[in-house]
Amino acid sequence: MTEAPMRPRRQMLTADRAKLCTKLTALCLALLAAPLYGQSGLAATSPGTVSYGSPTFAVQNTSDLQMQSPYLGGVPAGRASATALSLSLEDAVGRGLRQNLGGLLSSDAVSGEQGERWRALSALLPNLTTGTSFGVHQVDLKATIGIKIPVPGVPPVTGPFGVFDTRGYLDQSVFNWESIERARSSAAQVKSAQYSYKNARELIVVVVVSNYLLVIADQSQVESALAQRDTAKVLFDQTTDQKKAGLAAAVDVLRSDVELQAREQRLIVARNNLAKQKLVLARAIGLPAGQIFDITTEVAYQPLTTSSLDEALQQAYTSRADYKSLTEQVRSAELQKKAASAERYPTLSAIADYGSIGTNFASNHGTINAAAELRLPIFQGGRVHGDNLVADSLLTRARQQLEDLRASIDQEVRDTFLDLQDTAQEVSVAQNAVRLATQTLQQSRDRFSSGVTDNIEVVQAQESLADANDTYIGSLYRYNTAKVSLARAIGFAESNYALYLKGQ
């Protein structure tokens, strides 16, 4: 009997799985993540640059994505404890929503837009100031008011005398349509930033849950590798005993020893992958540096019954926070266009002051001044025309981005439906493959124990079971990730991720 070259195939399968998981995670984050910076405005992207949310960025360099994406980082809270932290999926999501860097930056962006809103309102609200002054003056009447003929009793130079003046000043815009439209535009930008913050929370849930599921998958890999190592150890001991009894050849002992060493190596790699994936999860949820933890939530296979595709699309268009955010940006751009056109309109403002003036504080008396100012723009050097061109460009760009996002949502929902159908079938097939591979291994071990065959058949059966376990773990991870992706695609990730994972 000729031994099949199973080792290169196993190494290729393990490497392919690692590459697939890495690409899935990177592409998931890149496709789902909206650009965090400039989310409250309509910032242009220069030709040749790649934004954080583009698939090209993720494919170019996954490590760069991990270093630069704010959703993969977090602000550590508290100090690490010596005891292991029990971390459930709900706890991980809660920590992520509080400490994830993407959410914190998005919250700061809302505060920034609220500040811009107040700046825009300041052009419409009253501006009230007060001032007090005191000075000593000496006046040359001849030089100041042009008295050339001496006046009896009036000296040519008066003073020195003091002047004390304290008063309040009021400046109020009565009519300025440009400022009104810009204030309304800033209000739309605040709403856009608030929706962007909600969208950031959705993305945080996807990132945290995906990383938590990866920890579960890696932990399952460790358990599978440990079981396979123990099985290989039993085979090695059994083969060694049979050789001592003269029932097995030396090559059978070597073959079982090679298999045992391979399983030891795979266990080492699996434990290392689990430890590194825990670090990724800890960073995303803001755990203190060096904090050890154990996951406590088990996510088993639960079939998900979904609504129809048309219903899911309608829910997405009405629920997605990023779609609402961009809709508000379109509205803001429309108001900016109106504001640019309003620069041609006249403006009316009122100014007034009231105070007390005199040579000193004791001899003051009240005075008041009031005036109205009407400004009629005639020619402003082409500035109004330029502002209108800029506003037109921003409005066109915002509308194009909204239509593109609508098409992107349609594609995303359809993709998740396809992924759910495909991965559900994968899980079913993988479960059957594990069952058959387990039976095959048991029968091969029985045949070897009975002396019907050598241990080549047992080694091959162990390889088949290892492949089947790897496939099942990967398919279950992809299926659960597809559930969370569907919740995100519809706009319910934060509120319904747990229900989707439970198949409800």
Name what the model sees in each region.
Residues T2-A26, L36-A58, Q138, A289, ...:
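Acidic, low-complexity, intrinsically disordered peripheral segments
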Residues S40-S133, V139, A289, T296-V330, ...:
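Bacterial Sec-pathway N-terminal export signals of envelope proteins
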Residues T45-G48, G74-L85, G131-Q172, I295-L309, ...:
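Small/polar, glycine/serine/threonine/aspartate-rich low-complexity segments that form flexible
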Residues S88, G112, V163-R167, S210, ...:
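Transmembrane beta-barrel architecture of outer-membrane proteins
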Residues G94-L104, S111-N127, P160, R167-S185, ...:
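A glycine-/polar-enriched beta->alpha junction
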Residues S122, K233, A262-L287, V434-F492:
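Short segments within alpha-helical structural elements
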Residues R201-Q315, D419, T423, S464-A466:
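Periplasmic alpha-helical coiled-coil/stalk elements that build and connect Gram-negative outer-membrane
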